[in-house]
Amino acid sequence: MRLHKNKDDFTEAVQAVSRGLNISPALIEKDYYVTLVLKRINEEISGLIFKGGTSLSKCHKAINRFSEDIDLTLDSEHLTEGQKKIVKPTIVKICEELGLTINNLENTRSRRDYNCYQISYPLLFENDEIDPVIKAETVFIQECYPEEVKQADSLIGEWLKANGFTKQAEEYELIPFDIHVQTMERTLVDKVFALCDYMLLDDMKKHSRHIYDIYQLLKRVELNDDFRALVHRVREDRKYHSLCISAQDNADVPALLKRVIETGCYKKDYEEHTRTMLYAPCDYEEAITGLEKIIDSGMFAKDEDYERNTIHISVSSAAKIASYKEYRLCKMPENGKYGDYTYKIPNKYVSINRSEKAIVFHLPKDYVVELRNGRTNQTAGLTVTEFAAEVADKDESAYGTKIIRPSQLSSDGNTHKKETGFNSK
């Protein structure tokens, strides 16, 4: 039984959690419905990935901010026209089942790359600062990576278990559930670019939340070479979209962040909106130091080495982008001979540009590509330029039959001996 179907128990639970956590009952109520909608969509749609600010609070426990939107996408395997087509009717069915209303249903379309479903719920607790509408956004424009499995739960569910009411939590189906979620590292990268984009578009309203989220994420995310590689890969993906201004080749992200700090363009919105959504206080002057850390780290500076070694491999059809052959790279030899170890190309070096039907490799300086077909060396020790020419000159079928999907590629860069990695199934 759903808790909101029992009005008395629901009211009592919301009030108890509100007192226990010192949070507005209107926030507790909305969080319940946000979690419920998320859970049901996750149960019904295969390949779903949860991302954005709500994933940071609900799954990663990285921020102390109430986030009211549900940001969803599909993984690369399920990002098909057929799967996109079922998303809208599934969300409609779920809302009808839960007694919720989609206010803008006529403005949504099946198979569209972006939809925002504005979902209203039966309101018991009013608060002028809380919009009683859940925004469930489905975005199928950019590939979502990396991802991991986390648990999600409502504030009511967490409070019930923490206070020994496990039986009641189970009775009202308020137990945690597993969901695929975008990693904190990727979300941090997205938020830095988004903060710059909204400033350039002069659209600061309700977007100062990114400043707070960046500040909190920096407590959990390590700014290292892997993170820098991720920044580069995301930038390559974003720059093909016209509204992603800060990802364009001529954009200087550190300079844009410096402008955010110096102009204080987000300060008013932070004071009026973001601060009111925090469970724990964090003033603007404290949060803005996160941008200074990003600037000082150099993670978003243009990387000449990566720029020089980025190559695009055209693919004949969109379908072939979803699955491709196994590529490997190895370190440039110092003695003229290639070593006994090669590296399966980690996800951080490979991205997929669906709009241009291309596989994109971002290779660090002094690396070369080694291409194999599962039986013998097809070509070894190609330079980046030679590799691009070699692949472009041959049909994909020339490289054997083993298919490795992007989600299956190694992301840790662990070494594999030549004689074992290529023939294993």
Segments and roles (model prediction):
Residues 1-48, 58-64, 75-307:
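Structured mid-to-C-terminal alpha-helical surface segments
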Residues 46-50, 322-324:
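Short, motif-level signal for alpha-helix interfacial/capping segments enriched in acidic residues
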Residues 53:
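Active-site glycine-centered loops adjacent to acidic/histidine catalytic or metal-binding residues
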Residues 411, 420-425:
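Non-Sec secretion/translocation targeting segments of pathogen effectors
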Residues 307-417:
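Feature detects long, helix-prone N-terminal segments enriched in hydrophobes
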